[in-house]
Amino acid sequence: MAAKVYFSREITPEKVLELYKMAGKELTGNVAIKLHSGEEGNQNFLKPDFWKPVIDFVGGTVVECNTAYEGQRNTTEKHKALLTRHGWDAYFKVDLMDAEGPDMVLEIPKGKQIQKNYVGKHLADYDSMLVLSHFKGHPMGGYGGALKQLSIGVASSFGKAYIHGAGEPEKIWTADHDAFLESMADAASSVVEYFKGNVIYVNVMKNM
């Protein structure tokens, strides 16, 4: 059955909540809220107050994982400090899913490039997921949206390198580009399969 997709030219926190309700699907149990919490120095990410109405309504936990590259999000200590500077933990419960190991491994038996996806261990604590994406261009992924959130976003620090390297993490920045994109699709499919359809997606084109 084809998924229902709703569109709106009005981009406000209230409209996001309205569209979520229109989906007509209840996310049950412990809900993971996957979004991009913002790089250091980036002023265009969608701030906590923009997402607050829908997150408060759902009552979930904002989840992130550490990065595989240098910066302010590649260690748990630095990442938590940045989340605080950006105001996320002032509004919501926040969980760095790969703050402690070992990684959780999702099998991808029909994966084209990768057959395993290494994700944050705490993913096992959640029963459903709300994917809140700031849809925009991305220099490597082409687009930054729901697929990237489900793949790179849910992957652990090691898992990110594994996807970028198309199964060879040591080739994180040198793997064939098409193989990387296919690895993202493989990884995203494993997260969708894990939640058995208990996922809702909201994509917002704002601050492009």
Question: At which residue positions do the language-model features occur?
Answer:
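Extended, low-polarity segments enriched in aliphatic/aromatic residues
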Residues: A2-P53, F57, T61-M208
